[in-house]
Amino acid sequence: MKIKYLFYIGVATLALSGCNDGFLERAPEAINDKTFWNTTGDLETYANQFYSYLPGGVTSIADGESDNQVPNSIPQFFWNQLSTPAEAASWCNWSKGGWQPIRLVNYFLTHYQTVSGKESEINQYVAEVRFFKAMQYAGLMRTFGDIPWLDKDLGTGDTDILYGPKLKRYEVMDKIIEEFDFAIQWLPEKPATGRIGKDVARQLKARTCLHEGTYYKYHTELGWADKADRLLKMAADETDAIMATGKYEIYNTGHPEKDYYDVFVMEDKTNLKEAILPVTYLDGKRKHGMSRTLAEANTGFSKDFVESYLCLNGKPITGNDQYKGDTNMKDETTDRDPRLKQTILTWDFPTRVTVATNDSTYIEKEEDFISQYCLTGYKSIKYFIPTDKAFEANNNTYDGIAYRYAETLLINAEAKAELGTITQADLNKTINVLRDRAGMPHLTLEVGFTDPNWPAWGYSLTPLLQEIRRERRIELAGEG
C-alpha cells in the first residue's frame, strides 16, 4: 500500500499545521515566542515548512540551461542575453524567495534553545533545519559565487550586516560543509516516513562537494586548485558511506529494454531501493501533472545529446558499423544504448493510449516529431505515461524521486577518477551497475577508444573522465 509522503508546508508566522497536539490546542492569539518554543513537537512543526523546498522529483525537462536540452524559447542565459544589473533586486533568485528560507532558518536557530527534551531529539530537528540552510546556500553560491553568510536573525536595524562584506566562494563552501556535517551527525539513519535522514544529507553534501571541487580544479584563474582535492575526497567519502549501508540498489529486473523507463513511471516508489528519498503523491492528497506537461509541446533534447549515446557494442557512433545514421528516428535509435529509446519519444512508443478501448496512437510521419511535440524532434518520455487519464491536468499520482541512488554511484566514480584513485573494482560497483541495467558493455579503466566528439570542455580530460561524464549525462538526462 502506498504510504503518504508529507511535504510539510507552513509559514513563518508560526500559524503552522502539524501533528503537535499541544500546538493545535493553543488559541491563535497565544502563539508567540514565549508560548511556542517549548517541546520537540514545536521544533518538528516549525521544521515542516522547509520540506516544500525539496525537489518534487518528477521532472525530465530540467536541463534547459545546458547542452542537453533546448527549450521552446531561448533562455536568457544563452546568446549573451544575460546582463548583470547595477542592483540585484529579484535578478536570478536574489530576492525574497532566495533569502527568505535563510531568514526562517536563522529565526529557528535563535529561538530553539528554550525547548526541553533529549539532546538527540532536539538536535534531530536542528539538523533538519541546518540541512535546508546548506541546501539553500549551495544554490545561491552556485549562482552568485561570493555572497554574505548570515547566521543570526536580523532586524531592520542590522544594516551593517545586511549590507556587509561578502565571503569568498570557498569560505561560503566551508560554512555549508559545517551545516551538512551537523545534519549528518544528528539526523537518523532510518528516518520516519517522509522525513530526511543521514543519507539525504550525505547525498547533497557529496553533490555539492563534487561540483565545487571540479569548479576549483578547472577554473584555474581563481587560484583555488589546491582546495579541490579536499572537496573531491569528501564527495567520495560521503557516497562510500551511502553505498556501505547496503540499503540501496539499482532497479534491475533483467529487462534492459524497459527497466530504466519503469523506474520513473512506477506508481508506488515507497519501497524502491533506488530512491534515497521518494516523493509520494496520492489521489485526494497531492498530485502532479507531469504527463500532461510532457504531452504538450515542450523542451526537447538536443541533437548533440542524442548523439552522445553509445551503440550497443559500447562504442560511440563515429566510425561505428552499428550506427545506422539519422535519416529517420528508427535508424537513429536502432542498436543504441537502450536508455535512448526509454528517454525520447520514438516511432514505436504510443503518444496516447485510450484505456477503455485499448487504442493507441503513434507518430506516423517523421516531421510530426518536430511539428507536434518539440522543436528539436527529441521529446522526453521520462516520467511520461501516455494513458488518457494521465493526460488530465494535475491528475498524476505516480511517485517521484527527490534523490536517486544512481547519482550516488556517479558521484562516487567521478570524484575518485578526479582524485586519480579509482580502480576497476570502483567502476564495477558504480558505472557498470548502471550499465548492467541497460544491458551495455562494462566501462574499463583503459576505455579502449577515443571519441572525436567528446565535448571540448576548455581543459583536458582523461578518456575515463570523459566516459564517466557521458554516463552521468545519459543516466540523469533531464533531471536537472
Summary of predicted features, one role per range:
Residues C19-A62, I317, G325, K330:
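Membrane-proximal, proline-rich intrinsically disordered regions
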Residues M141-T143, P148, P191, H211-T220, ...:
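Short coil/turn linking the two alpha-helices of tandem helical-hairpin repeats
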Residues R207, H211-G213, M234-M329:
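Polar, glycine-rich mid-to-C-terminal structural blocks
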Residues D146-R169, Y216-M234:
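Short coil/linker segments at helix-helix boundaries
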